[in-house]
Amino acid sequence: GSYIIEPTKQVISPKINETYWNGIIRHKSWEFSHLGTFKKELFCKVKRKDFMNKRGEYWATTSDQAIMWPMAEMAGPEHFKAIDEVLYVYNRLNPLSDDRAHRQDQLLTEQIIRNKKPYLRLETL
């Protein structure tokens, strides 16, 4: 869904066109941010190990990408709908947000997740 950044009031919406889905979407811009919704059955198809680091611990940061990349890959454009309506306020003033408090871990985790093998598109959901 779309969200508004506090305090700038900038509205952020997914920017996904037909060509976005060509190739490996993990290597493209991150568009599946806050307020992603999905079917439980799709979520259950994501391998548990893809939510974890090499030590078997769940990701401390960047879990949104660990969740959304595989589901977007499996669902494809036929089962994706961007919501332009603002549904979320993203508080950029929060000093505890991961990109402020744990930025290096966030960037490292993102690279690991982006380099994982993409999931295959499902025929049916």
Language-model regions, residue ranges each:
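Conserved donor NDP-sugar-binding/catalytic core segment of glycosyltransferases
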Residues: 1-15
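Catalytic beta-strand/loop signature of glycosyltransferases that borders the donor
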Residues: 1-3, 79-87
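Short, flexible, basic/aromatic active-site loop/helix in glycosyltransferases
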Residues: 11-29, 40, 44
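Catalytic core of nucleotide-sugar-dependent glycosyltransferases
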Residues: 25, 31-36, 100-125
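Short glycine- and hydrophobic/aromatic-rich loop-to-beta-strand nucleating segment
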Residues: 28-48, 87-88
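Short helix/loop segment immediately N-terminal to the Walker
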Residues: 48-59
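Acidic donor-binding loop at a coil-to-helix junction in glycosyltransferase catalytic cores
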Residues: 58-67
